[in-house]
């Protein structure tokens, strides 16, 4: 039994037309004389041409590690509309993970926190949700500096998670998104600047603020919300820091730890001064 990673719709269409004969040709741009014909009704020369056409396929051994499969497919995925990395994951890790990420990406809290700006095409919204899962559920000490490997691990983690665990993740995800929206408004997960120009949602900031807020207790969260003006002012300064800018541009282990550390210290500073203001 083979698992089709790419081309499922095309192969399925061929099967339905040639083998099962479930439909007739309609809306032909060329060869309009074939409109309305099923496969058996085509001229014999065309039937033979279709039946004798070779299909190229890459077969990967089932025992091949998922990360290797991911990299193999990424290398051969060059024709037509090239799949985005999350679309490849969606094909390789079918199951609980794919359904759960779809649910997460459709939550009102996520959509509003990102201000309707994360596109659903190419599954970019699901990749953001997967990043939340990875940074809040996986051990960052084991992060090898390759983000794609880390995200693949997240898919495997979700496929093995219990219903109770999935509920907990989604519940905390919604709360985290809501808090970030309360604090930053339309600037959530974006770099801040003194001109109040709004840039795009930044993946690195999404990951970092997610893990920081996720780990906070309710009391500290409320303090942060109460001190959001001061927090935003301090974060604006941090966004202008050259080393921090470099840290949110890269995905190596040092950069990931640096941005989490810098924002973590910023939050601690705000919480420590909260009672004095």
Predicted features by range, described:
Residues 1-156, 225, 233, 239-256, ...:
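Basic- and aromatic-enriched surface patches that contact anionic nucleotides/nucleic acids
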Residues 13, 57, 91, 176, ...:
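Small-side-chain structural scaffolding
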Residues 17, 135-139, 157-160, 183-186, ...:
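Amphipathic alpha-helical interaction surfaces
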Residues 24, 82, 110, 183-186, ...:
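A general structural signal for well-ordered secondary-structure junctions
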Residues 146-198, 205:
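Small-residue-rich helix-loop
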Residues 164-171, 226, 251-254, 258:
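Alpha-helix boundary/N-cap detector
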Residues 190-242:
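C-terminal hydrophobic structural anchor segments
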């Amino acid at each position: 039994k083979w698992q089709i990673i790419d081309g499922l719709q095309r192969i399925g269409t061929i099967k339905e037309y040639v083998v099962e004969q479930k439909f007739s040709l309609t809306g032909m741009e060329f060869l309009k004389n074939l409109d309305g014909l099923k496969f058996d009704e085509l001229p014999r020369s065309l039937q033979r041409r279709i039946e004798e056409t070779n299909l190229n396929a890459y077969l990967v051994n089932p025992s091949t590690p998922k990360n290797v499969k991911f990299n193999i497919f990424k290398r051969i995925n060059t024709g037509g509309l090239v799949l985005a990395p999350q679309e490849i994951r969606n094909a390789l890790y079918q199951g609980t993970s794919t359904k759960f990420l779809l649910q997460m990406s459709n939550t009102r809290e996520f959509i509003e926190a990102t201000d309707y700006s994360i596109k659903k095409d190419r599954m970019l919204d699901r990749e953001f949700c997967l990043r939340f899962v990875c940074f809040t559920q996986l051990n960052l000490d084991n992060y090898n500096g390759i983000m794609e490997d880390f995200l693949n691990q997240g898919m495997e983690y979700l496929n093995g998670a219990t219903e109770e665990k999935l509920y907990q993740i989604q519940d905390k995800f919604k709360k985290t998104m809501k808090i970030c929206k309360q604090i930053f408004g339309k600037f959530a997960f974006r770099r801040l600047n003194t001109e109040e120009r709004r840039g795009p949602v930044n993946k690195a900031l999404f990951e970092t603020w997610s893990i920081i807020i996720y780990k906070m207790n309710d009391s500290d969260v409320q303090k942060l919300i109460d001190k959001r003006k001061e927090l935003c002012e301090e974060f604006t300064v941090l966004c202008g820091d050259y080393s921090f800018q470099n840290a949110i541009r890269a995905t190596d282990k040092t950069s990931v730890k640096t941005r989490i550390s810098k924002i973590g210290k910023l939050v601690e500073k705000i919480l420590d001064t909260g009672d004095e203001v």
